[in-house]
């Protein structure tokens, strides 16, 4: 056998050592595979550089290397491409649309309208009514463009809030600010204003968005949250109506007729004189035009409600004085023709003509198309709500009395529904189970001739809200009284007189009406209108910035914790 020369053997041995090193299978770093860069950055499949973490060799740390978890890759195979994370999905671009925007100010404001000229004056610092214009930060430029005014430079009278909720809260703290909100962000804690005479809320609102003159290009959300005036509805609420005594005399003896009480318009207080039979100063009133405005408001509301504080039996007795009442059923015609829908009849006079007189009253009201709540042939009937559906929203009105216990119904007695917490709670639950979307509780309660609610009255009111009522509209005080917001729900303890002959004090000659606007199931706007009663029988609106201010101040003074 022939042996190879020594130099040939040495050459082959050297070649065997060199080739694996060149193939990358022998080294002191991590096995990055062919084509790896020493920096630990590999070319990914997309061609972009993607950071790949490197690993320190166990041998270099003085630790014996562990067995590989898999066989080494074939040095001749193609490298496995490094995966590159996908680019993050971009946020969807907000869709812009022409969105109705509404001028608003603080809840207690007496102003009802604003204009582009006034906005410009606010920004210029020349407005006598407002100190600043407040807008939502992300919407400010679009709103200013819609208003046709430029963004002020430098120190200005423009304030920007982070969102609509903050803006609404700001208006309560800074009562001399004008603001603009998208219509779908307007809530009851602010006062929505008309724009150049057009309104988006209330009885006189425009019927369609195409008729609203003020829109801004803003992001839109889902269609369900978009504002539609056709989906809004209104509720009118008034105080005590009594058709006996001086009222009957004013309507029948003088020949003014049943329609007279609701034919009023505006009135002014021209002076005050002394004195009434009780020794108090009372106002002298004069009509100031706009005849029929009261009827227009009542008839324009989708639901109109008041307290009917006397029986109207078939065989009535007119009383010239005293506190036992009964009314001519023919006078109900004026109530029905004014546009009322519901009469609350749970009060301390509804049984003044006994049980039969109460049932005849219910019959005479229903005969004229009026629903009743709060009294009936027995306790079950008395607790039955008046239910009205408006635009697919079912509204239940529950009425109760807390004054005349001897008039309360039982299982076998004709009478009124008692204002007892367990009764009200069960009735609210039953109304909800029957499909009510909105529940209004209408109690006759409290103390006469006092503006502030008593502690027990307030405690009960809060329990009723906790039980599921959406609002409480009370009466009996014969004064416009305290208002409270509890857990976002409004409570009016009393609205005062609407049609009554108590001309012996200013407080009993004045009252409030409510004009409430709802969006579906939710309350969107509140307007409280002060009025004074002329000729013992006819409410006429007072300007809340002038003569009506005394009524509004009386309410707000009695409401020290009102946040709006």
Model-derived regions, located:
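Flexible loop/hinge segments at secondary-structure junctions
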Residues: 85-227
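Solvent-exposed helix-coil-helix hairpins and adjacent flexible coil/strand "hinge" segments
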Residues: 34, 180-185, 529-531
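Acidic, metal/ion-coordinating pockets
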Residues: 224-564
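Short, flexible coil/linker elements and helix-boundary hinge sites characteristic
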Residues: 23-27, 47, 62, 148, ...
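N-terminal non-cleavable signal-anchor helices
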Residues: 9-10, 22, 42, 53, ...
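Hydrophobic alpha-helical membrane-insertion segments, chiefly the h-region
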Residues: 11-26
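Ser/Thr-rich, Proline-interspersed low-complexity disordered segments
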Residues: 17, 31-95, 561
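N-terminal Sec-pathway targeting helices
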Residues: 1-12
């Amino acid at each position: 056998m022939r042996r190879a020369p020594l130099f040939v053997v040495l050459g082959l041995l050297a070649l065997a050592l060199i080739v694996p090193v060149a193939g990358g299978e022998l080294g002191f770093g991590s096995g990055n595979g062919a084509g790896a860069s020493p920096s630990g950055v590999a070319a990914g499949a997309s061609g972009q550089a993607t950071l790949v973490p490197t690993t320190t060799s166990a041998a270099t740390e003085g630790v014996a290397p562990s067995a590989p978890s898999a066989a080494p890759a074939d040095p001749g195979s193609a490298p496995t491409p490094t995966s590159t994370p996908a680019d993050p999905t971009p946020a969807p671009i907000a869709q812009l649309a022409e969105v109705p925007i509404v001028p608003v100010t603080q809840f207690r404001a007496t102003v009802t309208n604003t204009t582009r000229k006034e906005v410009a004056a606010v920004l210029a610092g020349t407005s006598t009514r407002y100190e600043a214009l407040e807008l939502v930060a992300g919407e400010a430029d679009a709103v200013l463009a819609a208003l046709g005014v430029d963004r002020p430079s430098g120190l200005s009278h423009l304030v920007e809030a982070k969102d609509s909720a903050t803006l609404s809260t700001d208006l309560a703290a800074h009562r001399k600010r004008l603001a603009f909100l998208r219509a779908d962000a307007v809530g009851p804690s602010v006062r929505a204003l008309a724009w150049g005479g057009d309104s988006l809320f209330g009885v006189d609102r425009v019927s369609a968005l195409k008729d609203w003159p003020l829109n801004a290009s803003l992001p839109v959300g889902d269609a369900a949250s978009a504002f539609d005036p056709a989906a809004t509805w209104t509720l009118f609420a008034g105080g005590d109506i009594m058709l006996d005594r001086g009222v009957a005399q004013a309507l029948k003896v003088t020949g003014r007729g049943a329609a007279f009480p609701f034919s009023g318009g505006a009135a002014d207080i021209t002076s005050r004189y002394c004195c009434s039979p009780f020794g108090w100063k009372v106002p002298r009133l004069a009509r100031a035009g706009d005849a029929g405005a009261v009827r227009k408001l009542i008839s324009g509301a989708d639901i109109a409600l008041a307290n009917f504080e006397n029986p109207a039996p078939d065989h009535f007795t007119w009383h010239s004085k005293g506190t036992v009442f009964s009314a001519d059923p023919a006078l109900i015609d004026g109530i029905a023709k004014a546009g009322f829908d519901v009469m609350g009849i749970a009060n301390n006079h509804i049984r003044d003509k006994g049980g039969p007189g109460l049932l005849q009253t219910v019959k005479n009201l229903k005969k004229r198309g009026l629903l009743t709540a709060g009294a009936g042939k027995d306790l079950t009937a008395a607790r039955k709500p008046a239910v009205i559906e408006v635009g697919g929203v079912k509204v239940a009105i529950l009425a109760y009395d807390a004054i005349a216990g001897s008039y309360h119904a039982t299982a076998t007695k004709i009478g009124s529904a008692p204002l007892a917490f367990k009764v009200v709670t069960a009735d609210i639950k039953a109304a909800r189970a029957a499909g009510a979307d909105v529940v209004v509780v209408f109690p006759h309660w409290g103390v006469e001739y006092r503006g502030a609610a008593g502690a027990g009255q307030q405690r009960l009111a809060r329990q009723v809200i906790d039980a599921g009522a959406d609002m409480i509209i009370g009466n009996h005080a014969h004064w416009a009284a305290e208002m409270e917001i509890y857990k976002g729900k409004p409570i009016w303890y009393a609205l005062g007189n609407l049609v009554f002959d108590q001309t012996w004090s200013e407080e009993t000659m004045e009252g409030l009406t409510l004009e409430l606007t709802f969006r579906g199931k939710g309350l969107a706007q509140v307007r409280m209108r002060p009025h004074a009663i002329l000729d013992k029988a006819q409410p006429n609106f007072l300007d809340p910035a002038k003569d009506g201010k005394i009524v509004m101040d009386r309410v707000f003074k009695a409401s020290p914790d009102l946040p709006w």
